[in-house]
């Protein structure tokens, strides 16, 4: 896989997948499912595209019944394509996948999402917090409204979803929060995003300690540069041409390369002794976290 991508720019967050060139890769013939999540119910936020879509796809292949959220309007086409895909690959025993349009930045919406999933599937075994937005901006240009918007999307939503999902999660359940390599390395232009991703690391660690007595594991994934709709919606065309080249592997990841980390953390047979931990699929960008 080469580093960098054709110049392109999207003007609105969180970006659209179906217009990207090349389209992010969410599946691979090299991935061999083995019923790791047979009988499980998974809720994935931001599952219409990017890492979230790849996670939904892997979970469905592994036997889970999958629900995902998306932002109504710009993401409709991506969400419908993901739902179609999940219908195609779901196992015989899994229930039909569902998609839920919502703005996760508000508590009442997070409560409604959990209620819809429980009404459809009866419970939640795996909660994946993947939805996010980011903006390139100088500290002088950050205003209160957008700062609140980014924090609501990226970290408030995780608090609210966990709050309402917990009563429907039993011992052996798993919560997986998406943070980022920028929480460890920093980023000079993504200040709001970086702050939220640092908060997610601390939230994950504290929540893991709080829920350990209940037998619910809480972990995180801190991806490096990954080719998702957030990228052309955040960076200049010139930056897109070089995206991923700063890693020792000299390229960005595709979502399908990151999704197996979420499978591992969701599967009790694989990660039963993991809690409060962060996995780092980052191409070697950080090696001492």
UniProtKB/Swiss-Prot annotation:
Q: Name one GO molecular function term.
A: oxidoreductase activity, acting on CH-OH group of donors
Which controlled-vocabulary keywords does the entry list?
A: Oxidoreductase
Active site positions = 193
Q: Does the keyword Oxidoreductase apply?
A: yes
Protein residues bound to NAD(+):
43-67
The job of this chain, per UniProt, is described as: May act as a short alcohol-polyol-sugar dehydrogenase possibly related to carbohydrate metabolism and the acquisition of desiccation tolerance. May also be involved in signal transduction.
Residue positions annotated to bind substrate are: 180
Q: What is its EC number?
A: 1.1.1.-
Can you tell me which family this protein belongs to?
Belongs to the short-chain dehydrogenases/reductases (SDR) family.
The region called Disordered is annotated at 1-32
Record protein name field: Glucose and ribitol dehydrogenase homolog 2
Its organism's taxonomic lineage begins at:
Eukaryota, Viridiplantae, Streptophyta, Embryophyta, Tracheophyta
Q: Please list the coiled coil stretches.
A: none
């Amino acid at each position: 896989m080469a580093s960098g991508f054709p110049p392109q720019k999207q003007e609105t967050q969180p970006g659209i997948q179906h217009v990207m060139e090349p389209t992010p890769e969410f599946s691979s013939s090299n991935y061999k499912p083995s019923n790791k999540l047979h009988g499980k119910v998974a809720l994935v936020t931001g599952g219409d595209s990017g890492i979230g879509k790849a996670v939904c796809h892997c979970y469905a292949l592994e036997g889970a019944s999958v629900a995902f959220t998306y932002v109504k309007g710009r993401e409709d086409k991506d969400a419908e394509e993901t739902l179609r895909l999940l219908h195609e690959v779901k196992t015989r025993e899994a229930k039909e996948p569902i998609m839920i349009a919502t703005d996760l930045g508000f508590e009442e919406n997070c409560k409604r999402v959990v209620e819809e999933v429980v009404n459809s599937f009866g419970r939640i075994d795996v909660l994946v917090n993947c939805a996010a937005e980011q903006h390139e901006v100088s500290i002088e240009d950050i205003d209160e409204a957008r700062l609140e918007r980014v924090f609501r999307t990226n970290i408030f939503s995780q608090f609210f979803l966990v709050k309402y999902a917990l009563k429907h999660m039993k011992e052996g359940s798993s919560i997986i929060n998406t943070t980022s390599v920028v929480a460890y390395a920093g980023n000079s232009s993504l200040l709001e995003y970086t702050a939220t991703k640092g908060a997610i690391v601390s939230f994950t660690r504290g929540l893991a300690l709080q829920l350990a007595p209940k037998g619910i594991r809480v972990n995180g994934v801190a991806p490096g540069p990954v080719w998702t709709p957030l990228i052309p919606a955040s960076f200049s065309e010139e930056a897109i041409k070089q995206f991923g080249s700063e890693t020792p592997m000299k390229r960005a990841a595709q979502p399908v390369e990151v999704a197996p980390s979420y499978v591992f953390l969701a599967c009790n047979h694989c990660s039963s002794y993991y809690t409060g931990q962060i996995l780092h699929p980052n191409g070697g960008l950080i090696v001492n976290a």
